[in-house]
């Protein structure tokens, strides 16, 4: 009979196969009430599943991330049950959890709209109120397949067909609804108290655009209504900060159907883009990088030799000319190797740092495109460092300094780091991997940086460090990376002459600080809610006349600001001054300069900040000093 070891080290002996529910009840009524599932020797199981052997058992509640995951998975089933009751003709397919929630894909001719989400939620609430037991059943494979076919659930039958023969077929039943699932699930629908359906989208069956289009309903679920409300408030704030909306209201950029996944930059947006690019360019120039530029269209033979054609061809845009196949480059690395190969290099030339604002294109599925965050055409702040094995650690250490400096200057303080090590399938011997992994880890530890180890997550050609940012909404964005590459230089024939006159293959370090400039600008816009720091703002000051009498003076003020090096505009439209102020406040222009007859006569400007602060009347020289000081504060931080 099982002896159950608990997290506090105590052991409970039972004279019969015991369930996690019984174990929880033996500890206390509150724990039994709060229990969601059990964790038995590290495996999550349903509360009523018998444990027949000695085991280490933890009672998982909604306070445990695994408990919350189960709640969300079970809520996906609850939603599927509600949809089936409302629309019996629709088929259910799959319903996994995702970050902060879940989705379920439905098939059928009927279109689900966001207007129906409230009706579905109401039915879900009724089903939760009914507190149906959720029961796990083990089925014979063929019986399960036949059951779902008889129910008209052909997708479920297809899933069963694709499962390994060794797989145990389990069905979860709640009320009149049965679903194919591995589980585990909450013990009853009454455990599902706080949920919200958020949107409807399209999705291809199994993510393959050659398959039929399904309807995906997203939702979120939390242990209680307080946590749900907090999340929905964050969601609403994220909507207010959505870079696509701010891109329109601030006249920064747009995308359109004729060029999906490509960005049309407007004058203001392009100024922001160039400011970000110029910052990185200065950083590279001051730290020993040489900027290059390589072709956008490259013959497939180079991609075949680099290995990208075999691994990445489906994501390349390919064209043909004069019986030759060309690919629009999806990345810059092979071209950088070709630049390195021009002229034999000595060990004295290493490390050689080649940087490029490389324009890349990838044929991403149309359903994944999302404003600036997921595009088909983008520019990377890409660079490749060619070095010896002994130089890896120092180059990584220096790069980490650059990463932290850049993120700090752009206003990000919370940086998360992950170190990904050797996968099972890889090139290079273990000694080389040992050296590279040790170099990356030592560089991080020398900086006193905490990092998450991701065993087996490195590329086949080398380990890597990934840098992610946490923004003001607690969202995490993966941006920077530095990756050791033992493979590509050798594949493409890159060599240098070492100190004993022998030809050697250099190690190549792939590195980027921001990654895609488009994506980083999207993150910047959302992090600041469009109110970018003055040094980044596309328009730093706008001059607003009250009547036509001040128009010439407004043009003069604008011109003086431009000549002083500021990004300024004059708004001379025949509109009420209150309307102009509101409009430019919405556009998050840092300073608004209001000119009336009093300012015209005195040669001053009335200054308002975008936060609503009235800064009073200023001489133009005083305003220039204030703007300069605002921007200089950022520059002083860069120098620290």
Curated annotation (Swiss-Prot):
Q: How is the cofactor bound?
A: Binds 1 zinc ion per subunit.
GO molecular function (one): metal ion binding
Domain (TGS): give its ranges: 1-61
> Does the entry feature the keyword Signal, yes or no?
no
**What InterPro entries is this protein classified in?**
aa-tRNA-synt_IIb, aa-tRNA-synth_II, aa-tRNA-synth_II/BPL/LPL, Anticodon-bd, Anticodon-bd_dom_sf, Beta-grasp_dom_sf, TGS, TGS-like
Compartments (UniProt record): Cytoplasm
Q: Quote the Pfam families the UniProt record gives.
A: HGTP_anticodon, TGS, tRNA-synt_2b, tRNA_SAD
Keywords of the record, alphabetical order, are:
Aminoacyl-tRNA synthetase, ATP-binding, Cytoplasm, Ligase, Metal-binding, Nucleotide-binding, Protein biosynthesis, RNA-binding, tRNA-binding, Zinc
Residues that hold Zn(2+) according to the record = 333, 384, 510
Q: Which reactions is this enzyme annotated as catalysing?
A: tRNA(Thr) + L-threonine + ATP = L-threonyl-tRNA(Thr) + AMP + diphosphate + H(+)
- Which chain regions cross the lipid bilayer? none
**Catalytic, as annotated region:** 242-533
Q: One of this protein's GO BP terms?
A: threonyl-tRNA aminoacylation
**What's the stated role of this polypeptide?**
Catalyzes the attachment of threonine to tRNA(Thr) in a two-step reaction: L-threonine is first activated by ATP to form Thr-AMP and then transferred to the acceptor end of tRNA(Thr). Also edits incorrectly charged L-seryl-tRNA(Thr).
Protein name (record): Threonine--tRNA ligase
- Whose protein is this, by species? Halorhodospira halophila (strain DSM 244 / SL1) (Ectothiorhodospira halophila (strain DSM 244 / SL1))
Gene that this sequence comes from: thrS
């Amino acid at each position: 009979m099982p002896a159950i070891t608990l997290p506090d080290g105590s052991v409970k002996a039972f004279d019969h196969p015991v369930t996690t529910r019984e174990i929880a009840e033996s500890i206390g009524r509150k724990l039994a009430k709060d229990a969601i599932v059990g964790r038995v020797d590290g495996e999550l199981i349903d509360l009523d599943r018998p444990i027949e052997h000695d085991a280490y058992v933890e009672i998982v509640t909604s306070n445990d991330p695994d408990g919350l995951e189960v709640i969300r998975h079970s809520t996906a089933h609850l939603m599927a049950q509600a949809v089936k009751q409302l629309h019996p003709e629709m088929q259910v397919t799959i319903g996994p959890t995702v970050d902060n929630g879940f989705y379920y894909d439905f098939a059928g001719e009927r279109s689900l709209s966001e207007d129906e989400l409230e009706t579905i939620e109401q039915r879900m609430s009724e089903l939760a109120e009914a507190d149906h037991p959720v029961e796990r059943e083990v089925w014979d494979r063929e019986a399960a397949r036949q059951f779902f076919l008889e129910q008209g659930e052909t997708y479920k039958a297809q899933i069963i067909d694709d499962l390994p023969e060794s797989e145990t077929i389990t069905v979860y039943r709640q009320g009149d609804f049965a679903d194919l699932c591995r589980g585990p699930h909450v013990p009853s629908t009454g455990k599902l108290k706080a949920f919200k359906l958020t949107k409807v989208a399209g999705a291809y069956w199994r993510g393959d655009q050659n398959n039929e289009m399904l309807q995906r309903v997203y939702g979120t679920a939390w242990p209680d209504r307080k946590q749900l409300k907090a999340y929905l408030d964050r969601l609403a704030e994220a909507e207010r900060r959505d870079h696509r909306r701010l891109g329109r209201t601030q006249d920064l950029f747009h995308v359109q159907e004729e060029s999906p996944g490509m960005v049309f930059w407007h004058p203001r947006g392009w100024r922001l883009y160039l400011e970000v690019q110029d910052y990185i360019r200065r950083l590279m120039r001051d730290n020993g990088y040489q900027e290059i530029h390589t072709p956008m269209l490259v013959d497939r033979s180079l991609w075949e030799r680099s290995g990208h054609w075999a691994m990445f061809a489906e994501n390349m845009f390919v064209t043909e000319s004069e019986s030759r196949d060309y690919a629009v480059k999806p990345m810059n690395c092979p071209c950088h190797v070709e630049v390195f190969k021009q002229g034999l290099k000595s060990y004295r030339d290493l490390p050689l740092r080649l940087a490029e604002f490389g324009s890349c294109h990838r044929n991403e599925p149309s359903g994944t495109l999302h404003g600036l965050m997921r595009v088909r055409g983008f520019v990377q702040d890409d660079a490749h460092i060619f070095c010896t094995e002994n130089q890896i650690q120092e180059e990584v250490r220096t790069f980490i300094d650059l990463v932290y400096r850049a993120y700090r200057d752009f206003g990000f303080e919370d940086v998360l780091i992950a170190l990904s090590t050797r996968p099972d399938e890889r090139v290079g011997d273990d000694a080389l991997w040992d050296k590279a992994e040790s170099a990356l880890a030592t560089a991080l530890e020398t900086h006193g940086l905490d990092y998450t180890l991701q065993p087996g997550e490195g590329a086949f050609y080398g380990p890597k460090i990934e840098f992610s940012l946490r923004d003001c909404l607690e969202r995490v964005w993966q941006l920077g990376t530095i990756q050791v590459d033992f493979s590509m230089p050798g594949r493409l024939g890159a060599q240098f002459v070492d100190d004993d006159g022998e030809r050697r293959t250099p190690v190549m370090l792939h590195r980027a600080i921001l990654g895609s400039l488009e994506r980083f600008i999207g993150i910047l816009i959302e992090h600041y809610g469009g109110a970018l720091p003055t040094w980044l703002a596309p328009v730093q000051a706008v001059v607003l006349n009250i009547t036509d009498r001040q128009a010439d003076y407004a043009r003069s003020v604008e011109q003086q600001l431009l000549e002083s090096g500021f990004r300024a505009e004059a708004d001379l439209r025949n509109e009420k001054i209150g309307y102009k102020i509101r409009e430019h406040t919405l556009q998050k222009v840092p300073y608004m300069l209001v000119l009336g007859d009093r300012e015209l006569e005195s040669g001053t400007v009335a200054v308002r900040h975008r936060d609503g602060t009235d800064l009073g009347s200023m001489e133009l020289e005083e305003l220039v000093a204030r703007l300069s000081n605002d921007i200089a504060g950022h520059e002083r931080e860069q120098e620290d």
